[in-house]
Amino acid sequence: MFWENKAEKFSATNNEMIMIAGEKTDMFRDPNVTYNTDNAPKLLFRPDNDFILIASIEHSFSSKWDGGAIVLKQDSLNWIKFCFEKDYTGAKRVVSVVTKNISDDCNSVEIKTNKVYYKLAKAGNVITLYYSLEGKKWFLIRHLQFDTDKNLTLGFLAQSPTGKKCEVKFSNISYRAKRIKDPYLGE
């Protein structure tokens, strides 16, 4: 694993990581082209061609757009950020950002707790995103084509675009080099 934009603080024990993003950290390419940044701390690795990554994401939702995410990155203009984020209304939201030069930001389900489970699966050039409240029953959020000819990196991100910092806990982490068979069932 390697850092892209090192975290303000980081610790890891057993199957848990805590990552702290400093102020004004984000990864976004605004459709209005007024805000383009990629300074959020990311802990990344090179995944297999086909894989399933699962992790629970938990944080305190202190400031607008504070978030923790699973990230799949091809380069600075092509990436997916699957984020558990405090949205513009103050809600805790499942958010997926697919960037192919410009970010396509999709605000999905509102979550009532500070913790949710995420799953990102890759099968060839198809990426599927899921969430779960308990890590057992998975709900499909997004199913898309993503050009994956170049070397990809996969990992974890913390962000605090408007706040002073955001401390994110990633736990229940599971990585399998496996091709998903049924995108609707998540296995």
Residue ranges and their predicted role:
Residues M1-E187:
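Extracellular glycan-recognition regions
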